[in-house]
């Protein structure tokens, strides 16, 4: 990579780099791309920082994304919190004769019979995806990044790209936040959310996903694939919707659904276990695919919170609870109780083998579950605002 410019943006250092393609990325012809590094506000080289990886929309490139960051309310998802590094990627510079556009995936409105689209639709990553991952890893090596706090984000096409590139890379990304992603096909194809997986196919425990989309946005077509697939695979999706169209301004979106930013994604760490909630009784009915005229706001899994207490070789404990009014001010009537299935992900030390029987306790309830394919699930736990400790023993 070559440093081509240094600047200051909002009182924070900004660096622009160019990179030449590497043979292992698989491009048919050599190309040069640009990316930007945005420093924390009060940068201290002795500290380590989270990394916010930004995937731009179809209306932007790396340069115009930087311009958005200058103005509050302009594509708020691009804005990097003060105490984090930002990595702004680009897929616009080389769209002719490559699959770079749409970050290597299929859009919500793509013709799935198009040969150019078909060649993107598998578990195999495209050159642009390899380039993005390599750039993330290079950034982590060059700058003081906390390797357990790397997050992907994007708007529209970039929302599709962040899901498509990061969901299968739970070995790198702690979480994903997608604003009105213009398609979920990319993620579904790479992670086999609705397709039969090839024999032996497996991805690392995935990042936690926060997705907020609008049922009256044509670019949200197919969103049921993400919701149904994540639930079936027992991956954690915190999903939000409302009739806010293809919006990118947090304040405007909050007029329709003010729960969206209630979950602190920066609190998620790659090296910490988390519970994947599925089949929750408090989930709202999805507007996709058949209720797109609905004006109702809704959510899936938005009310759950947790805290890991113990993650040891033979014991694991975690507190499960629901959010309350002291956590987040909202127009929504917060539930006092929700029933959900709970699957543990990203266990660090408590790692049973397939076939192992695991004893669990949750308040007065207890039982046994069997580990299968590296995971185990306790069904229909009643989770309340006051919280309760879920315990596992080998």
What kind of feature is each model-predicted range?
Residues 46, 111-156, 167, 172:
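Gly/Ser-rich "nucleophile elbow"/oxyanion-hole loop immediately N-terminal to the catalytic nucleophile
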Residues 5, 10, 23, 32, ...:
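Alpha/beta-hydrolase-fold serine-hydrolase catalytic core, especially in secreted/extracellular enzymes
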Residues 147-197:
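Primarily recognizes the serine-hydrolase "nucleophile elbow" in alpha/beta-hydrolase
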Residues 33-48, 57-60, 64-76, 201-202:
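Short beta-strand-to-loop junctions in surface cap/lid or active-site-entrance loops
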Residues 58-135:
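Active-site machinery of serine-nucleophile hydrolases
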Residues 43, 175, 181-271:
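The feature captures the conserved acid-bearing segment of alpha/beta-hydrolase catalytic domains
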Residues 53-55, 179:
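Alpha/beta-hydrolase
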């Amino acid at each position: 990579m070559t440093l081509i410019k240094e600047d200051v943006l909002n009182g924070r250092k900004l660096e622009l780099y160019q990179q030449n393609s590497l043979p292992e990325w698989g491009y048919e012809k050599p190309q040069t791309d640009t990316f930007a590094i945005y420093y924390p506000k009060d940068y201290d080289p002795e500290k380590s920082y989270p990394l916010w990886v930004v995937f731009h929309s179809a209306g932007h490139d790396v340069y115009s994304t930087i311009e958005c960051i200058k103005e509050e309310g302009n594509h708020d998802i691009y804005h990097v919190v003060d105490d984090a590094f930002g990595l702004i990627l680009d897929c616009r510079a080389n769209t002719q004769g490559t699959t770079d556009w749409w970050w290597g995936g299929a859009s919500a409105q793509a013709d799935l019979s198009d040969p150019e689209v078909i060649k993107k639709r598998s578990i195999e990553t495209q050159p642009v995806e390899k380039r993005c991952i390599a750039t993330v890893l290079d950034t982590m090596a060059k700058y003081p990044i906390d390797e357990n706090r790397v997050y992907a984000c994007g708007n529209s096409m970039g929302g599709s790209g962040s899901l498509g590139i990061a969901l299968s890379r739970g070995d790198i990304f702690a979480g994903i936040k997608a604003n009105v992603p213009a398609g979920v096909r990319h993620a579904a194809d790479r992670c086999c959310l609705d397709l039969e997986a090839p024999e032996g196919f497996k991805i690392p425990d995935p990042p936690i996903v926060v997705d907020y989309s609008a049922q009256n946005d044509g670019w949200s077509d197919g969103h049921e694939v993400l919701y149904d697939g994540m639930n079936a695979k027992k991956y954690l999706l915190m999903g939000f919707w409302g009739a806010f169209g293809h919006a990118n301004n947090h304040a405007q979106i909050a007029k329709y659904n003010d729960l969206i930013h209630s979950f602190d994604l920066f609190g998620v760490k790659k090296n910490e276990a988390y519970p994947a909630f599925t089949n929750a009784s408090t989930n709202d009915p999805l507007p996709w695919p058949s209720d797109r005229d609905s004006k109702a706001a809704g959510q899936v899994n938005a009310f759950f919170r947790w805290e890991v207490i113990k993650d040891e070789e033979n014991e694991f404990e975690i507190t499960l609870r629901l959010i309350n009014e002291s956590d987040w001010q909202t127009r929504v009537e917060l539930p006092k109780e929700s029933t959900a299935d709970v699957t543990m992900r990203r266990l660090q030390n408590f790692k049973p083998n397939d076939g192992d029987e695991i004893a669990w306790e949750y308040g007065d309830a207890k039982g046994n579950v069997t580990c299968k394919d590296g995971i185990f699930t306790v069904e229909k736990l009643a989770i309340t605002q006051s919280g309760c400790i879920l315990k596992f023993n080998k």
